[in-house]
């Protein structure tokens, strides 16, 4: 497939999210949906799995999620039959904290290395291993 005219696609499908999902999955490209299992994430997970329940759902579980997040992840995974692929840091939380202490504060110079280890490396590994050509996410304008 050559060039995709996204302006034309957006003009045709507009804000019809289910139609956009159908169109994107209809391209026949390797697809993933990423999630952090915030409450509103269920919407995009539901939309994508309604079109193709086999799409890999990639979750970077940094080991620092709340009990509510883990319960929500389990509930949504079961209800939607998600093809969940969990990516964890290479070093477990208990090991990291035993050697380096608790999570460094945002203004602590060690925080950059912490972020690289528990968030960025698992994310980069997930993208390498899944090699998506179509990527769904519920990123909001207020997210960073």
Task: Identify what each model region corresponds to.
Residues 1-144:
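ATP-dependent adenylation/nucleotidyltransferase module used to activate substrates
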């Amino acid at each position: 497939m050559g060039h995709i005219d996204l302006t034309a696609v957006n003009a045709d499908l507009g804000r019809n999210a289910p139609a956009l999902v159908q169109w994107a999955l209809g391209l026949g490209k390797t697809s993933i949906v990423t999630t952090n299992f915030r409450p509103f994430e269920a919407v995009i997970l539901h939309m994508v799995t309604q079109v193709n329940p086999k799409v890999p759902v990639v979750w970077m579980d940094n080991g620092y999620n709340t009990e509510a997040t883990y319960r929500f992840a389990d509930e949504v995974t079961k209800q939607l039959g998600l093809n969940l692929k969990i990516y964890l840091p290479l070093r477990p939380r208990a090991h990291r904290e035993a050697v380096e202490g608790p999570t460094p504060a945002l203004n602590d110079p060690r925080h950059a290395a912490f972020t690289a280890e528990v968030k960025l490396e698992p994310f980069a590994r997930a993208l390498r291993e899944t090699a998506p050509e179509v990527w769904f996410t519920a990123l909001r304008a207020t997210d960073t």
